[in-house]
Each structure stands twice: as structure tokens, then as C-alpha cells.
Swiss-Prot record:
Compartment list: Cell inner membrane
GO MF term set: antiporter activity; L-leucine transmembrane transporter activity
Organism this protein belongs to: Escherichia coli (strain K12)
Activity control note: Leucine export is inhibited by the proton ionophore carbonyl cyanide m-chlorophenylhydrazone (CCCP).
Family indicated by similarity: Belongs to the Rht family.
Inducers of expression: Induced by leucine, L-alpha-amino-n-butyric acid and, to a lesser extent, by several other amino acids. This induction is mediated by lrp.
Entry protein name: Leucine efflux protein
Length: 212
């Protein structure tokens, strides 16, 4: 399938893409957190931010920016530390709000929803490892002798985005159903938010110590 477009072993790629999407990460956690705290609208806005951010990174990977980042340690470190700082900021903000017992529902909906999208977009864009991963993973399934490798890259990127959409939709719908139950269990919600905040701090520490 898609061999005429320079895609090799598409079904193997699809299985690999599914397993990759299932691996927990900050983007997934952010979408799940917002689907629980802000419902399906908040979850899908977070997912849209992730999709757009990933699409930009995939395009940059295809355009050769990944090679530039990999061969320029200073540039890699700048993006890496920005990403780590942002993850730490998000984690600290969640922990602070949880400890203070702030009620996010008291805020107006539109600013909150706009912030969700922006945070998800920034979260996705400030991950230098993602752009390097796209190149190293995609190149295994592209026929370099094909006349239009850009089409091959697009097919692989679109497939990954579709798999991600299906998985995140499952999380969003599940999170929305959990929302009503969580709202009646304030202690449980507080523990859950604290764990999410700590996980973001952990992701920040891991990203800060990664090497190119």
C-alpha cells in the first residue's frame, strides 16, 4: 500500500506508529488533563494545539531543520531548555493551583480555552527530540530513490496524525465522562492534579538531561 508513492512497508509503519502514540508523554498528559478539567471542548483544543505543533515539526524535519538541530549543539540546547522550562512552568502552575485550591471554573471560558490551545502548541513545538525522531523513524519507510519523497513523507506524517487523533479522541471522550465523577470527589481530584503536576516536573527534568 502506497508503494507507488515511495512508502516502504506501510503496514509495519502503521503498527509502529500505533505503539509510538500509545507511549505516555507530556502532550498526551496535557490533553487528558484538560479533557477532565475542561470537558471535551478543552480536550480537543489541547489536541488541536498538539496536532498543529506536530505538523510544524514534521514539516521542519522534512525541510532539513532536524539535521541543523542535530549538528548544532547550541541550537539543540536552546530548544531543549526552553521545552524543559515550559514543562516545569506547567507542572508548577498545576501544583500551585492544586495546593491553593483554586477553582478553574470560576474563570471565564474563552480566555481559558484560548490558553489551553496556546499551551498545547508551545508544549509540542518546544520538544527538540520530536523533530529528530520524525526523521529517524520516517526515513526507514521511505524509498530514497522515489521521484517525490515529499509525498512519501506527507503520507507517513498524515498517518501518524490520524493515529494520534484517534487515540487522543479516546482519551478526551473518556476524560469527559470522568469529569462529572471527579467533580464530586474533590480529594480525588486534588490527588490526581498533584500527580499530573509532578509528572510534568518529571518530564521537564528528563528533557533537560537529554543529549542530542
Amino acid at each position: 500500500m502506497f508503494a507507488e508513492y515511495g512508502v516502504l512497508n506501510y503496514w509495519t509503519y502503521l503498527v509502529g506508529a500505533i505503539f509510538i502514540v500509545l507511549v505516555p508523554g507530556p502532550n498526551t498528559l496535557f490533553v487528558l488533563k484538560n479533557s477532565v478539567s475542561s470537558g471535551m471542548k478543552g480536550g480537543y483544543l489541547a489536541a488541536c494545539g498538539v496536532f498543529i505543533g506536530d505538523a510544524v515539526l514534521m514539516f521542519l524535519a522534512w525541510a532539513g531543520v532536524a539535521t541543523l538541530i542535530k549538528t548544532t549543539p547550541i541550537l539543540f540546547n536552546i530548544v531543549r531548555y526552553l521545552g524543559a522550562f515550559y514543562l516545569l512552568y506547567l507542572g508548577s502552575k498545576i501544583l500551585y493551583a492544586t495546593l491553593k485550591g483554586k477553582n478553574s471554573e470560576a474563570k471565564s471560558d474563552e480566555p481559558q480555552y484560548g490558553a489551553i490551545f496556546k499551551r498545547a502548541l508551545i508544549l509540542s513545538l518546544t520538544n527538540p527530540k520530536a523533530i529528530l525522531f520524525y526523521v529517524s523513524f520516517f526515513v526507514q519507510f521511505i524509498d530514497v530513490n522515489a521521484p517525490h519523497t515529499g509525498i512519501s513523507f506527507f503520507i507517513l506524517a498524515a498517518t501518524l496524525e490520524l493515529v494520534s487523533f484517534c487515540y487522543l479522541s479516546f482519551l478526551i471522550i473518556s476524560g469527559a465522562f470522568v469529569t462529572q465523577y471527579i467533580r464530586t470527589k474533590k480529594k480525588l481530584a486534588k490527588v490526581g492534579n498533584s500527580l499530573i503536576g509532578l509528572m510534568f516536573v518529571g518530564f521537564a527534568a528528563r528533557l533537560a538531561t537529554l543529549q542530542s
